[in-house]
């Protein structure tokens, strides 16, 4: 029984000894046993290999990513004793395991792209395939679509112009043919009817405001000269420029138009002056009461009408003399002809037919001219103050 207790105490003492050694507590008595702590269990040779103290480490100078030179510096402030970071950005730290191996960096020399006159060598990237790069494909597609649209618009415009061009040419040709037929018809009608006067006016050369002389001259040119006091100007061959109507597509020189207008104006003013001077002379004789009963013979001026027209007039006047049985009718001279409203209407009809003259009117017989001539009323001269013209 006593042996068992001794063994139990022995194990208990050993256990307590181990606990005290672990906690570093010495000098404690457990009963009769003294436990000694801080026992050096190592050999005597291991006592000389103690770790030396850490020294400060410096970072070397380098070129950063912007090409600027960063000077070297030392890590000697407190606990920050190690050079840490990357090759392009370095700093001091206190963890040894994060220290940077500066021997692996290559940015200690000046970069090539900073040296003037030298281009950096092209580094082929094996991961980059230019055949698979489609970033510029969108630009090419947009430019191609715009170019195609522009070409389509241009060709469409050209096609429309070409489609409308034959119609315009046909219209211009048809208009030219119609104008040419009208001018030819007007010329033929004028040559057939010598008692009609064509009054040609060029509106481009006429002034904006017409004077009194121009108005009188235009009225006289439109009147058929049936009286011997007014010279006849109906002959189309006296003034060749009046009988021909110019082509509207041909631009005449302004000098010829001015000469034509001046000649027509001079002839009209001369006829107007002669007519009114002779009429004033007859009015003065009628006022004085000294008009003779026999007709006054006035020398006829040179007539511009053809001889055929005067013969027809004389023949018609002879018929008129046979019809009238008035005593004074024997004194009537067939050469004297007064104004008649029927002739004015006939002239208006002639001008109307000239504007709408068909092609068949050129082949009409010449006997239709006799329809334009009607016997006119004679002019009787008396001494009465209330003289009336019939």
Curated annotation (Swiss-Prot):
Transmembrane ranges, per UniProt, are: 135-155
State one Pfam family annotation. Shisa_N
- Leader sequence range is 1-22
* Topological domain ranges for the Cytoplasmic compartment: 156-390
Q: Which residues lie on this side of the membrane: Extracellular?
A: 23-134
- Subunit notes for this chain? Component of some AMPA receptors (ionotropic glutamate receptors) complex.
Which PANTHER family does the record associate with it? PROTEIN SHISA-9, PROTEIN SHISA-9-RELATED
Write down what this protein is called: Protein shisa-9
Q: Which organism is it from?
A: Xenopus tropicalis
Q: What is the lineage of its organism?
A: Eukaryota, Metazoa, Chordata, Craniata, Vertebrata
Gene of origin? shisa9
